[in-house]
């Protein structure tokens, strides 16, 4: 019997895993809540493929251990592949898939909601209300329709975000090295990132973590932006030089910051730190600021998205096992390792 083994299955994923099992009774499905590491790779022994999801790196040692267990067909439940040692994967003959589209709306909605909350100074108002301070001033907000919203990256998520912000009445501009023909016809694109930085009141990032994009938000780019800019990062943590953003917040150049992804999030996000020593002073500082909204990489986290991530990953893995073309194969190109 064909067997698929899944790693790092969360409680919220179990209903959708069981739904897939029920629809594929001829497949043996087993799983663990543990991450895939060199030590846990042996759990997959006897399986034909594995389904995985983690921010932890898929190192050469991890991939070797998985191959030693007889498994080289690996399906990610997420989109990001920058944490895979591609050279080692290629050497070992791995076949890898991901889920590039699971719910653009989930992430775009989160980015739009958080941006609007920053503009309205909701966190400051909530803090006042909690203290029973019901005065209006000085917590006056800005309307979305009065902003120029700059969207960096016009893929699936970026386009949904654009439509949402236009629904509020904002003027939307965009930049992408790969222009969408329909958006180009409608005149959304500016000529350069510099142009977008200079024109936008709100800047939202929707691009991948590739070397050219690392720390694209830095001291130099922030200096080019309008005074009182709002920066939104619900994409990848390494797009933002966190220290540069803190300097921009301290100077008042940046009005507010939305951060769902963080360059040092591995080992910190998705853990309960209540009553314990918090391990990251910089992150703690951002969380405590009244004009910063931090969420722990949960922009994607809806029932709709989680179901798609589980079901699509298992479908991809089964196709790999059966020698069929998967819906979203990953090219084993060299990356950061």
UniProtKB/Swiss-Prot annotation:
* EC numbers on record: 1.1.1.28
* Active-site residues, Swiss-Prot/TrEMBL: 236, 265, 297 (proton donor)
Annotated NAD(+) binding lies at 156-157, 176, 207-208, 213, 234-236, 260
Cysteine pairs bridged by disulfides in the record: none
- Known Gene3D superfamilies for this protein? NAD(P)-binding Rossmann-like Domain (3.40.50.720)
**Which UniProt keywords are present, listed alphabetically?**
NAD, Oxidoreductase
One Pfam match, by short name? 2-Hacid_dh_C
Q: Which reaction does it catalyse?
A: (R)-lactate + NAD(+) = pyruvate + NADH + H(+)
Task: Cite the record's note on assembly.
Answer: Homodimer.
UniProt family annotation: Belongs to the D-isomer specific 2-hydroxyacid dehydrogenase family.
- Can you say what this protein is called? D-lactate dehydrogenase
Q: Which organism is it from?
A: Lactobacillus helveticus (Lactobacillus suntoryeus)
The record lists the lineage as: Bacteria, Bacillati, Bacillota, Bacilli, Lactobacillales
